[in-house]
Regions:
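Charged catalytic cores and adjacent phosphate/nucleic-acid-binding surfaces used
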Residues: 5, 10-13, 23-129
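Acidic/histidine-rich, metal-coordinating catalytic segments
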Residues: 18
């Protein structure tokens, strides 16, 4: 938990990925709440349930918490083969079932992604070294 909390507080970190693995339990609510406070994104990874058995329940809890705390997410296929790029039917179904707000999905469309990237660029401290 502390490692995730420390990570979301680092100005150069934009997103927490692969957070639904049951092999690495953490205080999901504390991390999602802090990610929202710090303007960070939580990845929703389509491959989690395939590559990390047991992660679907954790991912569902994390997505629900993201909705509750208005934490932005990024949905991705985590494709390991070219035909899987952009393919995330399980994640889409989960988001629909939870009525997850589209405005919290930073890559729902190109405008939202551009807006997020511009916002993050303004927030990051400039290197002066």
């Amino acid at each position: 938990t502390q490692a995730y909390l420390n990570a979301v507080r680092i100005p150069w970190v934009d997103m927490i990925g692969h957070s639904g693995s049951p092999a690495f339990p953490f205080d999901e609510e504390a991390v999602v709440r802090e990610a929202a406070r710090c303007g960070k994104v939580i990845e929703v990874n389509e491959s989690s349930s395939k590559s990390r058995p047991g992660s679907e329940d954790a991912c569902l809890r994390i997505i629900s918490l993201c909705k509750q705390y208005h934490t932005r997410i990024c949905v991705d296929s985590d494709a390991h083969f070219c035909s899987q790029v952009g393919d995330f039917p399980k994640s889409s179904r989960l988001l629909d079932e939870l009525q997850f707000p589209k405005e919290l999905v930073i890559n729902a469309d190109i405008r939202q992604l551009d807006d997020y990237l511009e916002e993050r660029q303004r927030q990051k401290p400039k290197c002066t070294a």
